[in-house]
Amino acid sequence: MANASYNVWSPLIRASCLDKKATYLIDPDDFIDKLTLTPYTVFYNGGVLVKISGLRLYMLLTAPPTINEIKNSNFKKRSKRNICMKECVEGKKNVVDMLNNKINMPPCIKKILNDLKENNVPRGGMYRKRFILNCYIANVVSCAKCENRCLIKALTHFYNHDSKCVGEVMHLLIKSQDVYKPPNCQKMKTVDKLCPFAGNCKGLNPICNY
């Protein structure tokens, strides 16, 4: 079904920026416990998106959080490094420099970050490394000022706007009900072969070092 006349909404778009008279396509996974799907719901884009009015979308975004959302938010909370990456929107180097300057990353994460930086194609068999890096960042970095929007935009540029890579970031940082952790240090050394200095870092997981 054509969707050329509809705006595709993403979590990066604030409620205040919506056109209440427009029509949007949204991912229902972004509104778990808030949006009810029925047999009459019309899906678009191969069954991934649903159509919604701008006014209703505004109501969903400004509605008080549900009990499940509060529980999930409390579960996700942990000490993180508060870093605004708003300026990291012009290429890979800015993102890498910012992370290197602001976080005391373990050697395995530094290696992954540099491997992804040097790789001209964001995919190319790099899924495992992307997953580990994204999980690490999701667990140790946040931006209270931008509500993580700057972080998502920075990673979007880092991955050259590749739709699959950006989708992975959105899932881990926004849509997932749980915050995935990177593999523990033992697996990083024996399975992923990415840990050159086993036993020299704090804790049993890369996220213990930041």
UniProtKB/Swiss-Prot annotation:
<dbReference type="GO" id="GO:0019079">
    <property type="term" value="P:viral genome replication"/>
</dbReference>
<dbReference type="Pfam" id="PF03041">
    <property type="entry name" value="Baculo_LEF-2"/>
</dbReference>
<keyword id="KW-0167">Capsid protein</keyword>
<dbReference type="GO" id="GO:0030430">
    <property type="term" value="C:host cell cytoplasm"/>
</dbReference>
<comment type="similarity">
    <text>Belongs to the baculoviridae LEF-2 family.</text>
</comment>
<protein>
    <recommendedName>
        <fullName>Primase-associated factor LEF-2</fullName>
    </recommendedName>
</protein>
<dbReference type="GO" id="GO:0042025">
    <property type="term" value="C:host cell nucleus"/>
</dbReference>
<dbReference type="GO" id="GO:0039693">
    <property type="term" value="P:viral DNA genome replication"/>
</dbReference>
<keyword id="KW-1048">Host nucleus</keyword>
<dbReference type="GO" id="GO:0019028">
    <property type="term" value="C:viral capsid"/>
</dbReference>
<keyword id="KW-0804">Transcription</keyword>
<keyword id="KW-0946">Virion</keyword>
<comment type="function">
    <text>Plays an essential role in viral DNA replication. Does not seem to participate in the initiation step but is rather important for the amplification of DNA. Also required for expression from the vp39 and polh promoters.</text>
</comment>
<comment type="subunit">
    <text>Interacts with the DNA primase.</text>
</comment>
<keyword id="KW-1035">Host cytoplasm</keyword>
<dbReference type="GO" id="GO:0019083">
    <property type="term" value="P:viral transcription"/>
</dbReference>
<keyword id="KW-0805">Transcription regulation</keyword>
<dbReference type="InterPro" id="IPR004283">
    <property type="entry name" value="Lef-2"/>
</dbReference>
